Amino acid sequence: MAEISDLDRQIEQLRRCELIKESEVKALCAKAREILVEESNVQRVDSPVTVCGDIHGQFYDLKELFRVGGDVPETNYLFMGDFVDRGFYSVETFLLLLALKVRYPDRITLIRGNHESRQITQVYGFYDECLRKYGSVTVWRYCTEIFDYLSLSAIIDGKIFCVHGGLSPSIQTLDQIRTIDRKQEVPHDGPMCDLLWSDPEDTTGWGVSPRGAGYLFGSDVVAQFNAANDIDMTCRAHQLVMEGYKWHFNETVLTVWSAPNYCYRCGNVAAILELDEHLQKDFIIFEAAPQETRGIPSKKPVADYFL
């Protein structure tokens, strides 16, 4: 019981956007690893569930998400990756989600995004933030080790496939995803990379991605994949959509974006998708948390790069 009360105290601290001690991060990551190592590359999730897209260290907007969507454990959540980078509070955001995962493992599912990577976080903010807030890279090391244990995808009620980016020309079936050795840094190419980097595009077949990783995939590819796996749709994140969510290919692919006013300047709204026990869909649209609730960030954001 002492462990749970410790964890509850840490969750309360993190909810207030207060850091926990480095030794507590180490212990939290060790517990998280024990839970995550048991999860499948295609983690099974039961409805009802609320599906969320990118957060990118926008901690106060994550709090707003919980305000409109309900708290853990009352609401069952699936987050589709990109917890860190670009926002001011990647450390607090990731540690809060991880602490909730350890405390309520059956009520929150975290899958990996392309930013859950050592290489990417060294460029886009998380590494520098860990260094600034903890005075060393140790916390970054603990967290990036956990990234390697995150599931690559999820399947809700056997019918809705959830993944950060999209499909891969190397993957026709969910069973092929299940055979990937995920406990590694995100590779530069290949199926694991594609799942985290690809985007839908109004085309047929496969196209070269302007991102330099993953592929563009067309409606025919999705139709084949959905039929082969007897699923209704693919749900993904990875791309900013100004309206918070966007349907593609006759409602067979859905993009969900959950970081409002992305990078504190894009002016977009955010969305989360509520699925009931019959997989009926309800979108909740929300805006950035009001300025007065935010506190003052400790540093200007990282330099601009393409969004």
Curated annotation (Swiss-Prot):
Pfam families, sorted: Metallophos (PF00149)
Membrane-crossing segments per the record: none
Signal peptide stretch: none
GO annotation, biological process: cellular response to interleukin-1; double-strand break repair via homologous recombination; regulation of double-strand break repair; regulation of double-strand break repair via homologous recombination
Posttranslational mods: Methylation at the C-terminal Leu-307 is critical for interactions with regulatory subunits and functions in DNA repair.
Main location (coarse class): cytoplasm
Protein name: Serine/threonine-protein phosphatase 4 catalytic subunit
Organism annotation: Rattus norvegicus (Rat)
